[in-house]
Amino acid sequence: MFARGQKIDRRYYGKDVPNFMELPNLIDIQIQSYNKFLNKEKKTDETEIEGLESVFHTTFPIESTNEDMALQYLSYSLDYDSIKFSEIECKQKGLTYSVPLKAEIDLFFKETKEIRRKNIYMGDIPLMTERGTFIINGAERVVVSQIHRSPGVIFSHEKGVYSSRIIPYRGTWLEFEIDQKKELIYAKLDSKKRILGTIFLRALGYDTREKIIDLFYKTKTAKISPDRTEYEELIGQVLARDVYVKGEDGEKRKMHQAGEKIHPHNIDDLIQNDVKKITIIDFKGKDSLDSQIIINCFEREEIKYTPDPAVNDEPTVEDALNAVYSVIRPGDPITYENAKEDLHNMFFTARRYDIGKVGRYKLNKKFDYSDDVKGTTLIEEDIFKTMKFLIKVYIGEESIDDIDHLGNRRIRSVGEIMTDVLKKAFSRMERIARDRMSSKEMDTIKPKDLISIKPIVAAIKEFFGASQLSQFMDQVNPLAELTHKRRLNALGPGGLSRDRAGFEVREVHYTHYGRMCPIETPEGPNIGLIVSMANYARVNEYGFLEAPYVKVVNGVATREIEYLSAMDEDKYFIGQVSSAIGKDGKINTDQVSCRKLGDYTSISPKDIQYMDVSPKQIISVSASLIPFLEHDDANRALMGSNMQRQAVPLVFPEPPRVGTGMEKKCAYDSGVLVKAKRSGKVEFVSSDTIIIAPEKGKNKEDKDEYTLLKYQRTNQETCYHQRPIVNVGDTVKAGQPIADGPATYNGELALGRNILVGFVPWNGYNYEDAILISRRVVKEDMFTSIHIKELSTDVRETKLGAEKMTCDIPNKSEKSLDDLDSEGIIRIGSKVKPGDILVGKVTPKSESDTTPEFKLLNSIFGEKAKEVRDTSLRVPHGTEGTVIDVQRLKRDQGDDLSPGVDEVVKVLIATKRKLREGDKMAGRHGNKGLVARILPEEDMPYMEDGTPLDICLNPLGVPSRMNIGQILESELGLAGLKLNEWYESPVFESPSMEQIEAKLKEAGYPTSSKVKLRDGLTGRLFENEVFVGVIYFLKLAHLVDDKMHARSTGPYSLVTQQPLGGKAQFGGQRLGEMEVWALEAYGAANTLQELITIKSDDMHGRSKIYESIVKGEPSSSAGIPESFNVLVQELRGLALDFTIYDAKGQQIPLTERDEELIKREKTSTNF
């Protein structure tokens, strides 16, 4: 058996591929984002303001409607000193771990210049633990990062229409589209009706054709001459400037308008009027548009808006604004000045439009502005540059954007999501403050009277409690915790929805390389929408995912590492990291595999600019824990990644014999280990305390004490337990693990056990992925786990008096109350079974039905004779175990309980679950199955030296599934077992077949890893040799004890009176329509009659038959099923009067009301 406390020396065994970079902290995405939100670095630079500071800046100052007073913000502070409870106390008491937010606010009066200053409490902000989680109402939660469409400009071609959208963070969506039939460009505001592009530009103030032409085209001067060649060259050109000539009266008059096409008779006119030069559009000029779309728009204007030529020959700004407003707000009268200001505010003021830091960055990058534009609103240049670029896309000079490219999708982490939530809450607060300003007395008013924190508190509570992105932490094991914090979700508010997301969004995209894992994603409707971050990826300041690369200069890999976003990466050739790189970084091959823009080729090392930092940079943490991943089919690798997260922590965990080197990092960053704060010497170790004397202590008393958590319940009811791994006298460094957590061993992740496997069918017990396992595995507790259930009860105040905890429970035998103390609470250490009382509690019964005799007795004997009901907390069905803890929260001791509750008692029951038939087990390669039989070890097939196998898997489960990694892992594991070696074989650099064969030879096994096996039952040799190895197997959180369920009678649905469904409701099975058909087919009339009536929903018949069974009398006839009554009531709901009569013509009552009416009728007829 694997010895506990054994030190493990892992050796690298693989292809010697250089790793240029250590793994970063794996939960940085959570911690850094929240620190930015809390502004821990206290940035005050205007351009860098984000998080809480930006929330205050966008809301304040708040001015009253008549502008006589204003609330001004000075600064905020987080009052860390007044945090009342620690993380553990918050968990026990069901509270939120948070810090009070206070803000210094001035109330400024304009007339008197008086300032009233106050430090105002603005609510509690939940704090993130150092593990990257939040504790909300006593439960650990994680805020998952969201991946969404980046603000900015997008050019697309959908359903045959070329369009572009400027997507803001907040504000009006501006779209442009090209009408291909008529070759016109249109603008759309918030997806309303179309507005001609040039009309929209005129509304913005570009009031003449000349101005509009200058935005899109370069111009050139042309001579007018009767020369034939020059004459013909001018035909078909377009005027860029108006042409004026002198009239007879000496006045200048416009002869031709800019935007007109030149015809031969125009040239004749010009020659006649002695015009020597004209300015025309140079379509082929640098930065000019080679398209007549804008000119077509001018022609369209003439048709649609026919101005009075005597006054003006083209639409004015006023005409354009009227046209725009007839689309935005049809039917609303608006003045010219208001319309102009409103349109300006719509795009160019920060109050109404915000493209965000990201949107601005994207626009600057797209349109190559010579000096970067600052600010987060649009500028006019953005609008016409977007139109120009769209026309270039249409004529094929530019390409459309790929919406799934990671340059167009960005990450919103906790901090940003929280900022958005608070901004909305603060704007509600602002509205309330404005209303109060106009209604309060100015003399006595204080800042506190104006600010209401209700919307802020409610928004925070709602976000953490109910948002789709705030999730109950997946805490089955450390890996599940870690991956949950690194998850990226495309769903949620402002994201996609499952039903509308197509294949393209879910697909693996070439930009995912090194940023998002192509393997780890759920199976089912969320596939591709929920993904994991790759190992080395990080999020940059704009929210885009970046991957690290090593710079390559002249075919030599330097040690310089650069992070590239998906947009930057598109420009370079990026080489693959391989074993052909020398110690000095020189690439010793003529050709290197590389990629650019999703194409994979081989080129000379001199031509590549960057190189991957590590082979495992393309996958996520879960996938990089699978050895020999490169030999598995991707679908099975996906299952393997997902199932490792479901592995239940075992009582005696063991790290994998064939690991990947990620086990240490994964356990370290998950936050389950206890790490030393300072270097020093261990002075004291017990099961729950470690004391370390630091090297650089202030004095002898300055010691670090660490308290370990014992037998804590996790969110998924597994056991969270820490145990020391250092001894007295050991020297430890700062950051070194000193205690293991759940599913870890010596600071390494240990999700399962290494067991001896044979791939051999055995009497059909491993048919269809079933697993045959040896009893030795159960006997030695190899796969035993502890599960902890929490049951709680409230002691309430009722209308008839308070409930009472007591061990004096009516009608209960002394024996059933043996384990309760004087207050009726079970003692710790008791073994309990279903139905046992955990907390004795009685509730007063209503006294309305008491007889006068009882009242007399009550008045004589007082409380004792009063009737009480037994409402004790009992062990639910299917639960048994040992009581390990009882926690009590009392109102009179200052605990915050819900209204009407005086005390809450929580009882924790721990159950030891051994492996049994029906439990789900799996390897790391997606090879899963159910335990079908546990065989005595003497009956298991055994090797020539007498060693029986631990587990038999079906060989047919390997070839069709194409997960050969399990075979290679088993071979190397077998050699490791014999040689007592532990291997580190990282993904994509795992040992070759020759290396594995060398190890097998060294261990004295055949290189095929096939040995002769004997049948345990007969002792005879199997016909063929059998493949034997050591495989790492996990027990998954799908335990048969949690799924098995039986019911005799139980709760019924109120309306239909049919049993409820499901184990959680202690439900039964419904005999539905199809089951009735089956019985009808057999003509089983009597069975059917009782199944449909008295065994099901005939309430009257049900109680009658029960009575007759108890009394031993013959059963009475059946009554009317409740479902029939439901049908009758539905018909009555349709205003159809529905009554039933028996053979004698008497009405049969269907409801209690019917009974009353029939009784009334009888009594009235009797009179």
UniProtKB/Swiss-Prot annotation:
Catalyzed reaction equations: RNA(n) + a ribonucleoside 5'-triphosphate = RNA(n+1) + diphosphate
GO molecular function: DNA binding; DNA-directed RNA polymerase activity; ribonucleoside binding
EC number(s) reported in the record: 2.7.7.6
InterPro entries membership: DNA-dir_RNA_pol_bsu_ext_1_sf (IPR042107), DNA-dir_RNA_pol_bsu_external_1 (IPR019462), DNA-dir_RNA_pol_su2 (IPR015712), DNA-dir_RNAP_su2_dom (IPR007120), DNA-dir_RNAP_su2_hyb_sf (IPR037033), RNA_pol_bsu_bac (IPR010243), RNA_pol_bsu_protrusion (IPR007644), RNA_pol_Rpb2_2 (IPR007642)
GO biological process, one term: DNA-templated transcription
Keywords attached to this entry: DNA-directed RNA polymerase, Nucleotidyltransferase, Transcription, Transferase
GO cellular component: DNA-directed RNA polymerase complex
Keyword flag Nucleotidyltransferase: yes
A matching Pfam family: RNA_pol_Rpb2_7
Entry keyword annotation includes Transmembrane: no
Disulphide bonds in the chain: none
Transmembrane segments: none
Top-level class of the enzyme under EC nomenclature: transferase
Family to which this protein belongs: Belongs to the RNA polymerase beta chain family.
PANTHER family xref list: DNA-DIRECTED RNA POLYMERASE I SUBUNIT 2
Functional note: DNA-dependent RNA polymerase catalyzes the transcription of DNA into RNA using the four ribonucleoside triphosphates as substrates.
HAMAP family in alphabetical order: RNApol_bact_RpoB
Subunit structure: The RNAP catalytic core consists of 2 alpha, 1 beta, 1 beta' and 1 omega subunit. When a sigma factor is associated with the core the holoenzyme is formed, which can initiate transcription.
Protein name as it appears in the record: DNA-directed RNA polymerase subunit beta
Organism listed in the record: Treponema denticola (strain ATCC 35405 / DSM 14222 / CIP 103919 / JCM 8153 / KCTC 15104)
